[in-house]
């Protein structure tokens, strides 16, 4: 079984097959999704204290915060090969 892995910054990696959406954190509905995930204990903050620039939503309901742009994450998602994405932060 080949799993594509996506580098989301600072050495953090996500399984590409589990990603449902990659969105910007600016809108009120996305802020509400982040808040709800925090309350459920399903929020993963991978920003290392930096500004959140991308919100990754998984099929398991987990919400992952990343400090890199959604376009960058999406590009890595589209170009990822099985195993670890060679892009590094």
UniProtKB/Swiss-Prot annotation:
InterPro entries documented for this protein: RemA-like (IPR007169)
UniProt record similarity statement: Belongs to the RemA family.
UniProt-listed NCBIfam families: MtxBflmRegRemA (NF046064), PRK04323.1 (NF003315)
Name of this protein: Putative regulatory protein CYB_0055
């Amino acid at each position: 079984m080949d799993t594509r892995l996506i580098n989301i910054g600072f050495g953090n990696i996500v399984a590409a097959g589990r990603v449902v959406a990659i969105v910007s954190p600016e809108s009120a509905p996305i802020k509400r999704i982040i808040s709800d995930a925090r309350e459920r204990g399903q929020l993963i903050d991978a920003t290392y204290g930096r500004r959140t620039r991308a919100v990754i939503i998984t099929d398991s309901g987990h919400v992952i915060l990343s400090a890199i742009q959604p376009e960058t994450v999406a590009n890595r998602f589209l170009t990822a090969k099985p195993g670890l994405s060679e892009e590094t932060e």
